[in-house]
């Protein structure tokens, strides 16, 4: 975690070469220091934050006036800081009838913000202030500040479910973790109207950029675990599976069990779990297979690597198996030597400095907020199973000397359809997760996908892929923009890397050409815009038979003549 001084210093760095994001910050108290922290954190996380800050206490006026500076700025992200202190001040100035409506009035404004605001909205919820007017009886009094504040925070979560572009930054949770005295300095507040302490600002700005980064497609996908003294106490090779320290009884085993429960919940929400251990593989697997106190089982692990090779090389093996970026991986190990080895030799992997006491693991990891996400779909629950099935495909492929014969043996089937209310969440999520196979690196929210779905200027395609081993779910998305009566532009083409080298690219292009011919279009335009991660598709369009029409060696546009196109061979059947 950076200090505020480091964040302030970062704002002076040259960020012109970084991806630009326009961020509007509006608050009902002084927000200058918060603005500095957010901008600095953004730069240190490789974003060029162009930040517009509203004048003091102008939130409602800026949002409700369509001609305001806020709308002229056209932000990508709108950050709103309504402080608990100002809400308490308002509560103190009105009668009990109006006090009972305090939460509803604020919620009405938030809904208006969701309807009228620009881009994604990040809203800080409300840390608790116990005014002790009613004591504990406040929970029974509708007009009490405690009642209204609790209602407000609860209903904000319901609004976030109703509006896909509305995200809550959990300031109340941060305050609960660090304490009110850490978050707030009364002497500073009365003289400056600044609510948040200098010590709290780095944490809050980090959580804010966590949300932005997740929406932009930068988030952690995989947790790699050491075993001995990391997920259980003791060394299984020396102590045996029956003597490792784990279980719900008193003692250090309880800490390891609760840590495993945390990992299990991460797996259930879609984080890939891998093992990287210096052990004999058979011995390393015994606790998962035989110890009844273990929460984690082998079927929770997508990739299990246990040998006596160095862990840097083993993590590279895991990365190749999963085909994800190193920067989307987290490695946890109790051994400082192993942590430093991975930090030095595997650039990009996040390696937290675990405390010496396993009882402190979870509280420390809670502070890092490693696994921020901007979406969740049913497919996430099956991610570990999908990678385990992929291992079976790889094993089968090794028995074939002819790739075509292998692909035929998979019995692949794809369902092709446009966007609808059922697949919209997964389409939006895949846009946020896809980095390598993403021709223009376009990101979408559910609301944006829904808008495209109903716009006649676009044609939308979603592709699933199933085979003899199982269903990969929705794995490819294409959005065609109808530029004129003869020309289609591939606005968006992204695909899950899990299905590379299956012929899906040929199948999808055949589908696009069929659509173009059926609707009288003569040409399809494709564009490649380079990013830090999509170099693998730099030659995508030439490989498919497109001809370059403009651009240099990197960013370029290509055209495909629909009339002369010959259907490409693939071994995928349309469902």
Functional labels for PLM-detected ranges:
Residues 13-20, 37, 44-54, 60-198, ...:
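Alpha-helical cap/lid subdomain in secreted, periplasmic
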Residues 221-236:
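Asp-based phosphoryl-transfer active-site loop
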Residues 248-273, 312:
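Short, acidic loop-to-helix structural element flanking the phosphoryl-transfer center
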Residues 268, 279-306:
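Substrate-recognition/cap helix-loop segment adjacent to the acidic, metal-dependent catalytic center
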Residues 290, 415-495:
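A conserved beta-strand-loop-helix scaffold within acyl/acetyltransferase catalytic domains
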Residues 315-336, 342:
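Conserved Lys-Pro-Asp/Glu-containing loop-to-beta segment of HAD-superfamily phosphomonoesterases
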Residues 321, 343, 347-410, 514-575:
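Terminal substrate-recognition subdomain of acyl/acetyltransferases
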Residues 465-468, 474-551:
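Acyl-donor binding region in acyl/amide transferases
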């Amino acid at each position: 975690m950076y200090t505020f001084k480091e964040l302030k210093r970062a704002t002076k760095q040259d960020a012109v070469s970084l991806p630009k994001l326009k961020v509007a910050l509006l608050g009902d108290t002084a927000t200058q220091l918060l603005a500095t922290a957010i901008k600095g954190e953004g730069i240190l996380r490789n974003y060029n934050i162009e930040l517009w800050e509203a004048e003091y206490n102008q939130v409602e006026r800026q949002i409700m006036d369509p001609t305001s500076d806020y709308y002229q700025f056209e932000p990508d992200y709108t950050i709103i800081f309504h402080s608990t202190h100002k809400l308490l001040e308002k509560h103190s100035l009105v009668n009990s009838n109006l006090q009972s409506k305090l939460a509803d009035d604020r919620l009405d404004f938030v809904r208006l913000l969701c309807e009228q605001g620009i881009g994604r909205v990040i809203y800080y919820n409300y840390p608790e202030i116990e005014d002790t007017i009613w004591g504990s009886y406040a929970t029974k009094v509708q007009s009490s500040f405690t009642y209204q504040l609790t209602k407000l925070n609860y209903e904000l979560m319901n609004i976030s479910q109703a509006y896909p572009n509305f995200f809550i930054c959990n300031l109340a949770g941060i305050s609960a973790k660090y304490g009110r005295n850490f978050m707030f300095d009364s002497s500073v507040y009365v003289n400056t109207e600044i609510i948040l302490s200098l010590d709290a600002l780095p944490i809050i700005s980090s959580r804010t950029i966590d949300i932005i980064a997740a929406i932009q497609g930068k988030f952690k996908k995989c947790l790699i675990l050491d075993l001995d003294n990391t997920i259980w106490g003791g060394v299984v090779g020396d102590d045996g599976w029956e003597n490792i320290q784990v279980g719900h009884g008193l003692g250090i085993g309880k800490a390891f069990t609760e840590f495993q429960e945390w990992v299990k919940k991460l797996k259930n929400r879609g984080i890939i779990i891998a093992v990287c251990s210096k052990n004999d593989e058979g011995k390393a697997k015994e606790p998962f297979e035989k110890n009844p106190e273990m929460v984690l089982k082998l079927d929770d692990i997508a990739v299990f690597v246990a040998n006596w090779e160095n862990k840097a090389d083993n993590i590279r093996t895991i990365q190749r198996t999963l085909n994800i970026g190193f920067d989307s991986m987290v490695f946890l190990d109790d051994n400082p030597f192993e942590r430093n080895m991975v930090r030095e030799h595997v650039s990009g992997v996040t390696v937290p400095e675990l405390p010496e006491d396993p009882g402190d693991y979870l509280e420390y990891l809670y502070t890092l907020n490693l696994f921020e996400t901007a979406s969740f779909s049913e497919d996430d629950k099956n991610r570990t199973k999908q990678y385990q099935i992929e291992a079976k495909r790889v094993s089968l492929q090794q028995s074939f000397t002819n790739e075509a014969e292998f692909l035929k043996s998979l019995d692949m089937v794809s369902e092709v359809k446009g966007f609808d209310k059922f697949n919209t969440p997964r389409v939006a999520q895949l846009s946020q997760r896809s980095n390598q196979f993403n021709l223009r690196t376009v990101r979408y929210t559910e609301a944006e996908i829904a808008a495209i779905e109903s716009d006649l200027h676009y044609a939308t395609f979603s592709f699933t892929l199933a085979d003899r081993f199982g269903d990969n779910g929705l794995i490819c998305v294409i959005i065609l923009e109808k530029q004129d009566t003869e020309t289609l532009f591939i606005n968006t083409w992204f695909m899950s890397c899990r299905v590379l080298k299956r012929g899906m690219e040929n199948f999808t292009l055949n589908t696009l050409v069929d659509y173009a011919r059926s609707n009288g279009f003569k040409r399809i335009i494709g564009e490649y815009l380079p990013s830090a991660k999509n170099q693998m598709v730099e030659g995508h369009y030439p490989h498919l038979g497109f001809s370059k029409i403009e651009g240099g060696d990197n960013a370029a546009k290509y055209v495909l003549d629909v009339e002369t196109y010959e259907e490409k061979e693939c071994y995928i059947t349309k469902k």
